[in-house]
């Protein structure tokens, strides 16, 4: 124009791709993404009565994000609604807390160990989204200037696991080993009557390289035969989009307003019979290293 400002071709008279201008979009549309991520880990422990240790640990992972998009009112995808702006605010909290008691004792060639513990995990995700149209200015930086509310929503997802566990182990002369473990977990993804699952494992190993008949095999640093059998649990339920699904046991309702009156409609029927998926594992392995370098 006469003042030297760039005047873009909005393309009203083009036979195709009207009201688009890629260069103008880069200049007049805007996207802001602000993210804060905090990671905190705290550990404390003590040793007492010679053979006992107690450890407490906690961790927190907190994410805050604000994502803003503003599309101008002259050209591009939002020209027909005189500009469009949206803001999404997201907060995710992941908290883990552990308390573990260990016991270790040597009795000559005998070694005994035991461990009991408790773990709690909590995940909370909260989001708010708003979108407005009809902006009087070519470029606005806040939704308050939009005349019409096009979309407004919020969502909260929560997931919690509580677990108790224990393990015992014994070995003789650093040669023969046996161990057993047990764990009981409760997940918020299941109904209260089927929330808890029991999981366990047993194992044994034989360090062959410690036997007398191997004393001439100086090149063999370690040779161990291992076998284990156990049951593991899985509560990772997915929806039709393969995203985490936290409420499979609950009935779900969606908003269904009638003009100026609020309303809901039943969308999903929960399944209270869902429970932990259990996987049985049997493993046999040979662990070795020789020449002080090859494993």
Regions found by a protein language model. Give the residues of each.
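N-terminal, post-signal-peptide soluble/periplasmic segments
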Residues: 1-5
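Extracellular/periplasmic, surface-exposed regions of secreted and cell-surface proteins
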Residues: 11-71, 80-295
């Amino acid at each position: 124009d006469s003042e030297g400002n760039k005047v873009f071709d909005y393309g009203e008279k083009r036979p195709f791709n009207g009201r688009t201008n890629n260069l103008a979009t880069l200049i007049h549309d805007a996207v802001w993404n602000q993210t804060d991520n905090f990671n905190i880990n705290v550990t404390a422990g003590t040793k007492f009565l010679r053979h006992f240790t107690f450890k407490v640990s906690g961790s927190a992972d907190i994410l805050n994000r604000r994502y803003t998009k503003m599309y101008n009112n002259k050209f591009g995808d939002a020209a027909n609604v005189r500009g469009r702006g949206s803001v999404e605010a997201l907060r995710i909290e992941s908290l883990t807390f552990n308390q573990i008691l260990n016991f270790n004792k040597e009795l000559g060639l005998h070694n005994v160990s035991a461990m009991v513990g408790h773990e709690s995990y909590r995940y909370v995700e909260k989001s708010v989204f708003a979108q407005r149209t009809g902006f009087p200015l070519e470029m606005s930086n806040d939704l308050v200037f939009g005349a019409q509310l096009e979309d407004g929503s919020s969502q909260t997802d929560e997931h919690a696991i509580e677990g108790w566990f224990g393990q015992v182990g014994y070995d003789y002369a650093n040669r023969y080993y046996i161990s057993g473990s047990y764990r009981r977990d409760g997940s918020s993804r299941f109904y209260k009557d089927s929330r808890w699952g029991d999981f366990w494992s047993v194992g044994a190993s034989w360090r062959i390289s410690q036997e007398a008949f191997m004393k001439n095999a100086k090149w063999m640093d370690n040779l161990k035969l291992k076998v284990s059998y156990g049951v593991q649990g899985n509560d990772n339920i997915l929806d039709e989009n393969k995203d985490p699904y936290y409420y499979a046991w609950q009935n779900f309702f969606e908003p269904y307003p009638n003009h100026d009156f609020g309303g809901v409609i039943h969308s999903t029927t929960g399944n209270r019979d869902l429970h932990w998926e259990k996987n049985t594992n049997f493993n046999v392995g040979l662990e070795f290293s020789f020449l002080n370098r090859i494993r």
